[in-house]
Structures are given as C-alpha cells and as structure tokens.
C-alpha cells in the first residue's frame, strides 16, 4: 500500500472523552471515529487490524472442525420468549416492532437463533456432534458505554455453538475449543491466561474465561507462580492454612464508642485486623411458610466477602441480600457491633470463613452498641454452625493446586467458553432421534471471542509514550519503507520502490510512505500507528550499501546491509 493513496487520520492531541489508553490511541492513530454513544466507524487503519484478527480466529475455528454460518442480528422476539430471556435480559436487549407490528430484538447473543436452526435441521444422533460458528455484529444497549470499543453498544464477536448427544461428547469439544482459543490468543501475540470462571447469566455447568493481562483490566485474575492454575478471583478457592491455637486470653468487653468499621475498631484498640473477625448479616433461604431467617457470615477483618461463593451456600439466599433492620431487631443485634457470641443459641446460622475459623484470642463485636469483645475464642465463647470458603483470595495465598502461591493481576476478558447443558435446547425443544429411535434433548456448548475487544486489549498490553506497539500478526502493516527526500531524489525513490516490490513478493504487508511530508511527521505517524518495522532509505545509506532499520520496540536505529535486513525481517 502506498501512503499517498491511504487515509492517514492521525491526531496530535488526545480527545477529552477518551479515558483508557486503547481508546486514546485508536482515535489518535486514525483507527476509529465515534458516530454516537457506543457506536464507532472503523477507518481503513483500524479495519486492517480488525481483519487480521478476524482471519486468525477464522483459520483456527476452521482448523478445529467448526463450520461457519451467518445469522441475522435482527431476531424474532418470540424466540426470546420461548427461552425465557425476553424479560430476564433487561434493558440491554433492544426491543422494537416492524411495520407489521411484529416484535423483534437486536441480538446481543445468538443462543436462541442457533438453537432454532438446530431444532429444524438436526434430526438424528448420527449428525452429532456438530459445532457452528459465526463472526457477526452484536448489539447491547449498555446504559453507560465507555472505554471506546472495549465496552461499546455495537461490537463484533465470534460466537460458536456445539450440539451433542452426551456430556462426554460436549467435554471433548469443550477441550478442543479450549485448545483452539489458546492457539488463537498465542497467534495474536497476547499475554493471556485461561481462567476458571463463574457461568453467570448464560448458565451452564462449566466455564473458562480468557483474559489478556493489562493494568486497565476490569477483572482480578489469580494465578499460580509455579503451575498453570488460574481463576477469576470470584472463583479461586481460598485454601485453609494452619491450625487453631489454644486460647491464651480471657474474654473481655471493651468500650468502642462510634467505632463501627473493622479498620476503625482495630486502630482504636491497637489491634491487628488479621486478629479480628467481622460480621455480615444476610438473608437466608425462606422456609415453607415464607419466613426468611438471618444468616451470620464471619470473615477475618482484613479479608473481603466473595458474594458468588456466599450465594452458593445452600442456606444463603441468592442474590445476596443483607438482613433488614427489622430482622436485626428481632434478634437484638446492632449493625457494626455484631459478634459470634450467642448467635447459634439464638437460632442464627453462623457460617465462618476458613481463615477466620483458625483464629484464637481475636477481636469481635460485642452484640452491644459501642462495645467490642477481645480475647474471643471459638467453641469456648462462640459456636460455629459451619466452616465455608467465603472470601476473595489475596496475593500470596497458597495456590489451590498445591503448587506455588497466587499472584493477582488485572485482566481484560476477551474470550469465554461455557458448557451450557440443556438450558436452551430444553426451553426451545431441540431434540433428535437417538439410537433407540426415541427423541432426546441435545446438550450444548457455547464459545465466544470479542473480536473488536481483542483489538483494544492488544493495545492496552502493547504501547509506549509514542503510540501503539502492535504484535506483528495483527499490525495494520508489518513494514514501513520511508524514502528520504523522495520528491527530490529519484535514486532513493527507485531503491524504495524496488525494496517495496521485493518485500511484497515475499509475502510481507508493506506500507511505502511516499507522502510529501517532513521525515519527522512520517516517523511520528508510523510510531503512533505501531508498525513493527521501519526502513529508511537515504542517499548516504545507498552510497554505503546499507538501510536504516528500526524495530518499533528498539531504542536506536541500526544500519544494515540488505542481507542483514532481510534476515532480520525473516525472524
């Protein structure tokens, strides 16, 4: 591509509404332009990157044996009513009617559409397993679109859906897709982690997320220093460490006026938060008569409650909800001063986190306003109904697989795979005839990659103060050739044209910067756009038989012979 025929839409200043670095650099590099809130036009520079991501995803999906389809973004509302998600999905689902007053939605996902296709086209177990995928636009009417294409309303996804006769077959395809995703993100040149994840609103029995590690990520990822273990912090198990020591202190009540938070109390008492417990009083599961009990959750003072773990306890109501003031009053409890002493005797279920369960001589609420207890010990002073993993893991915790300790970093979710089971096939009646001639409900899996999000995530992981530093596989151009004073020096232009033709013939994606611009402007643009290799051709270099080469990550340029240059580019 000749730069003189290409749209350069670079900006010198960062737009005020761009918050994260990927949004800033995509605007400045001329990759995207905002059309409306959460809607972006992809310019030629951005489209080249997008298509390269698209190509790698498509190649690996085809390699996995999946078959490409293309489904409508506009979907009949009746399908969503069948699945039960028409009302469940909430305002992110854009609903509308056509001129004939028929209700439709703009698809944020395609489970309903693909299940409808499968129930009409798949008739026998002999057609299973099968895996369909598409690369298609989605629309979610986000209340606050932000971070550019990272959280936009309209975006491109690769979504795949598999259909199976057995759980074993689903597991086989799930494993294939896990490996396929790992190959995709490796080829994209990203530092990523596959992590165990919660199945969330889509549902199902097993789930992994694929996260690109970046400081701007929205999720906390815990991974082992010595193994492949990795999990979303929401899912990572907090391993029990140590045993409870025998009591050495007497139980005692102390005045703590107006000290309600654990931090305030520990500072007031000159105590270590690690030697304290804090209470969270939540609603339990209602009984047959509709009575809602109170459940007391206790954690170590320096730990945070993991709501997803708490909601998985069979005695805790989901979604998690705090006990009401009326419920607290019924048991004579005061928020901010609740301790475990006497709660079991009052009929309150006391669930204690593993780390809190091994404490002795600890600080706790006194169950009286403006008072706390010190020297509290389990069994002697307070009873436990059950010990349960309730907390978020922290850096330095033992890895659940017994290998190394946990590190925690921020991650950007770019892929997600689920074992859906029969959630959608049951709801939409997707059945095939079995070997015995009887119909059975098929089992499903689904697998998504945020294609547009991958582009932003790659930038969040690869940039400096000059601009983007693309992994070569998805750079808009792999190589930029800059002939110095090309409009005055036919010799440099001729040499640039010859090298341009040669590199293109070798399969490189090359930009010949033949613009009538100052060298400084060209260099700034090329660094901002993140082109991995820059070759400058000048009169002095031609006299010496060398080319000036600079890799995007290099601090200094170097003069190379043609043979050295070609060897460098071939690596």
Swiss-Prot record:
Catalytic activity: tRNA(Pro) + L-proline + ATP = L-prolyl-tRNA(Pro) + AMP + diphosphate
Compartmental location: Cytoplasm
GO biological process: prolyl-tRNA aminoacylation
Keywords assigned: Aminoacyl-tRNA synthetase, ATP-binding, Cytoplasm, Ligase, Nucleotide-binding, Protein biosynthesis
Domain of life assignment: Bacteria
Enzyme class: ligase
GO molecular function list: aminoacyl-tRNA deacylase activity; ATP binding; proline-tRNA ligase activity
Pfam families recorded: HGTP_anticodon, tRNA-synt_2b, tRNA_edit
Entry-linked Gene3D superfamilies: Anticodon-binding domain, Bira Bifunctional Protein, Domain 2
Main location: cytoplasm
Enzyme Commission designation: 6.1.1.15
Function of the protein: Catalyzes the attachment of proline to tRNA(Pro) in a two-step reaction: proline is first activated by ATP to form Pro-AMP and then transferred to the acceptor end of tRNA(Pro). As ProRS can inadvertently accommodate and process non-cognate amino acids such as alanine and cysteine, to avoid such errors it has two additional distinct editing activities against alanine. One activity is designated as 'pretransfer' editing and involves the tRNA(Pro)-independent hydrolysis of activated Ala-AMP.
Complexes and interactors: Homodimer.
Domain notes: Consists of three domains: the N-terminal catalytic domain, the editing domain and the C-terminal anticodon-binding domain.
PANTHER family linked to this entry: MITOCHONDRIAL RIBOSOME PROTEIN L39/PROLYL-TRNA LIGASE FAMILY MEMBER, PROLINE--TRNA LIGASE
Family: Belongs to the class-II aminoacyl-tRNA synthetase family. ProS type 1 subfamily.
Protein name (database record): Proline--tRNA ligase
Lineage: Bacteria, Pseudomonadati, Pseudomonadota, Gammaproteobacteria, Moraxellales
Encoding gene, per UniProt annotation: proS
